[in-house]
Amino acid sequence: MARKKEFRYRGYTLDELLNMSLEEFAKLLPARQRRSLKRGLSPEQKKLLRKIRLAKKGKYNKPIRTHSRDMIVLPEMVGITIHVHNGKEFVPIEIKPEMIGHYLGEFALTRKIVQHGSPGVGATRSSMFVAVK
């Protein structure tokens, strides 16, 4: 039976990533995310990070909600559920190790998948001559 492979980000385990400073972790990220972290976190992102740290300690028991879709998923966020705004509502997202280095907004889709109903009368040329029920 195959054992589940242990998660690694750029060769580092989750425990090693958790022990790194933000600057050390930023060096592992792709250029766009590295540049974003190098510029520093916005006040909204700092507030979100503060809430996440409190939730990890068990001192913040309300759902963590944010509009900050441009926040990069950091190793310390793993295991927490964050409600990310998609423009209409807050979508609950459980942070998994595989999400590290991505933006929160990538996981809360802003567009709904179109599910077409059955076509109405007059939708096609042949349906114009079908009797209406």
Curated annotation (Swiss-Prot):
Cellular component terms, GO, for this chain's entry?
cytosolic small ribosomal subunit
Q: Which GO terms describe its molecular function?
A: rRNA binding; structural constituent of ribosome
Q: Which Pfam family name is an example for this entry? A: Ribosomal_S19
Provide the GO biological process annotations: ribosomal small subunit assembly; translation
Xref: Gene3D superfamilies? 30s Ribosomal Protein S19, Chain A
Keywords, sorted A to Z: Ribonucleoprotein, Ribosomal protein, RNA-binding, rRNA-binding
Would the keyword Nucleotide-binding turn up in this protein's UniProt record?
Answer: no
- Relate the protein's function as given in its record: Protein S19 forms a complex with S13 that binds strongly to the 16S ribosomal RNA.
Similarity comment: family membership:
Belongs to the universal ribosomal protein uS19 family.
Name of this chain's protein: Small ribosomal subunit protein uS19
User: Which gene holds the coding sequence for this protein?
Assistant: rps19
